Amino acid sequence: MQAAQGEGWHDAQLDFSKSMSYGDYLALDQILNAQHPRSPDHNEMLFIVQHQTTELWMKLMLHELRAARDCVRNDNLPPAFKMLARVSRIMDQLVQAWNVLATMTPPEYSAMRPHLGQSSGFQSYQYREIEFILGNKNAAMLKPHAHRTEHYEQVKAALETPSLYDEAVRYMARHGFAFDADCIERDWSRPVTYNASVEAAWLEVYRDPTHHWELYELAEKFVDLEDAFRQWRFRHVTTVERVIGFKRGTGGTEGVGYLRKMLDVVLFPELWKLRTDL
């Protein structure tokens, strides 16, 4: 006798009246009801979903970056390799996501822009924490989060804590590499800047990668990550220019001009310079 239509479909469970479903597990009711357009314009939904999904990916990036930093701090490098590789692949995902937002034309964005107020991706506290964990620190960037104590404290902690790269240098110092004293203990709220003793240590690693394999692998994971981050920043600039030209950003920055300056930021300067010096 044939089962009634809808019952026993490929032996899949179909009744979730007493068990957790896919939607329950993912809290889809909350997620899919978190989009609240402020304009009547059809295209605002794209704008909201683009930024919300980016924030979800950044949540995962932070999960991986914090764990990787802890691994390096605790002298356990191998697990960090997978975590950093995952962050790079997330960045690849975010690079491709700009293609979707780029379907919004200038007139479409102009129709909804008045409804955005002063809100801007510049104010993302998760993005700011990512920048700080990667060493691009600027204490002035705490101010946009002062109105939300929990966000402010989270970002401030990242500002005042050694970056992932700082922890790598400290790891190397614990394992016999020589550094200037201020590379090991300093004001961690200051951004990473080039240091000759740091480059010398990494050059030693790169000149004998077999002997220093774990550090060599870590360094290449850093380069992979910064490479992906640079691509994301470039697509950000070109997408913004394509949609709004050189208008000022909603958050008050000079828009494309500001984003172009960010292209010059180098997160791991010694790892790039040594390629010339090898």
UniProtKB/Swiss-Prot annotation:
Q: Mind listing the UniProt keywords for this protein, alphabetically?
A: Dioxygenase, Heme, Iron, Metal-binding, Oxidoreductase, Tryptophan catabolism
What Enzyme Commission number(s) does the record list for this chain? 1.13.11.11
Q: Describe the reaction catalysed, as an equation.
A: L-tryptophan + O2 = N-formyl-L-kynurenine
Q: Superkingdom, according to UniProt?
A: Bacteria
- Residues annotated as binding heme are 236
Where in the chain are disulfide-linked cysteines found?
none
Name the enzyme group at the top EC level: oxidoreductase
Q: Which GO terms describe its molecular function?
A: heme binding; metal ion binding; tryptophan 2,3-dioxygenase activity
BP-aspect Gene Ontology terms = L-tryptophan catabolic process to acetyl-CoA; L-tryptophan catabolic process to kynurenine
Q: What is an example of a Pfam family matching this protein?
A: Trp_dioxygenase
Binding residue positions for substrate: 47-51, 109, 113, 250
The pathway it acts in is: Amino-acid degradation; L-tryptophan degradation via kynurenine pathway; L-kynurenine from L-tryptophan: step 1/2
Cofactor remark from the record? Binds 1 heme group per subunit.
Q: Which cofactor does it need?
A: heme
The similarity comment for this entry is: Belongs to the tryptophan 2,3-dioxygenase family.
Query: What is the annotated role of this protein in its UniProt record?
Result: Heme-dependent dioxygenase that catalyzes the oxidative cleavage of the L-tryptophan (L-Trp) pyrrole ring and converts L-tryptophan to N-formyl-L-kynurenine. Catalyzes the oxidative cleavage of the indole moiety.
Q: How does it assemble?
A: Homotetramer.
Q: Quote the HAMAP family the UniProt record gives.
A: T23O
What name goes with this protein? Tryptophan 2,3-dioxygenase
The record lists the organism as: Ralstonia pickettii (strain 12J)
